[in-house]
Amino acid sequence: MKAQDLRTKSVEELNAELVNLLGEQFKLRMQTATGQLQQTHQAKQVRRDIARVKTVLTEKAGE
């Protein structure tokens, strides 16, 4: 997910994306805690996607 793609979305779409990513992050954390997560890079990727969405939301709030 690129920030440029996120900038074209509306605030409602960004909030929905943020909720989805937070749910995904929770699932990944539970898998990590139980030792089931094989692809550990996914946690880092989701964390950075959350940061990208929050950054774009902050930019849109300033407009």
Curated annotation (Swiss-Prot):
<dbReference type="InterPro" id="IPR036049">
    <property type="entry name" value="Ribosomal_uL29_sf"/>
</dbReference>
<keyword id="KW-0687">Ribonucleoprotein</keyword>
<dbReference type="InterPro" id="IPR001854">
    <property type="entry name" value="Ribosomal_uL29"/>
</dbReference>
<dbReference type="InterPro" id="IPR050063">
    <property type="entry name" value="Ribosomal_protein_uL29"/>
</dbReference>
<dbReference type="InterPro" id="IPR018254">
    <property type="entry name" value="Ribosomal_uL29_CS"/>
</dbReference>
<keyword id="KW-0689">Ribosomal protein</keyword>
<dbReference type="GO" id="GO:0006412">
    <property type="term" value="P:translation"/>
</dbReference>
<dbReference type="Pfam" id="PF00831">
    <property type="entry name" value="Ribosomal_L29"/>
</dbReference>
<comment type="similarity">
    <text>Belongs to the universal ribosomal protein uL29 family.</text>
</comment>
<dbReference type="GO" id="GO:0022625">
    <property type="term" value="C:cytosolic large ribosomal subunit"/>
</dbReference>
<protein>
    <recommendedName>
        <fullName>Large ribosomal subunit protein uL29</fullName>
    </recommendedName>
</protein>
<dbReference type="GO" id="GO:0003735">
    <property type="term" value="F:structural constituent of ribosome"/>
</dbReference>
